[in-house]
From Swiss-Prot:
The lineage of its organism: Bacteria, Pseudomonadati, Campylobacterota, Epsilonproteobacteria, Campylobacterales. Promotes RNA polymerase assembly. Latches the N- and C-terminal regions of the beta' subunit thereby facilitating its interaction with the beta and alpha subunits. The keyword Nucleotidyltransferase applies. GO terms for cellular component: DNA-directed RNA polymerase complex. GO terms for molecular function: DNA binding; DNA-directed RNA polymerase activity. Keywords: DNA-directed RNA polymerase, Nucleotidyltransferase, Transcription, Transferase. This is DNA-directed RNA polymerase subunit omega.
């Protein structure tokens, strides 16, 4: 799936709020870089952490609530 399609799906998950999406992706990418386990099947050696985080949001695996709670 193309990045544009994933981004469109992720935006729908956060109510089309680009600020929320960027916050969620940035925090989740940081967590992934610090050793968190990806919630989607992704080859972390071939994908950037931000792309994995975006895919997690698009699939509804993570949202703003999880970021605020510190998960």
């Amino acid at each position: 799936m193309r990045t544009e399609q994933i981004t469109a799906r992720a935006l729908k998950q956060v109510g089309d709020d680009r600020y929320k999406l960027s916050l969620i992706v940035a925090k989740r990418a940081e967590a992934l870089a610090n050793g968190a386990i990806a919630l989607v099947d992704a080859d972390t050696s071939k994908m950037k952490f931000a792309d994995i985080a975006l895919l997690e949001v698009a699939e509804g695996k993570i949202g703003l609530e999880a970021i605020v709670e510190g998960k």
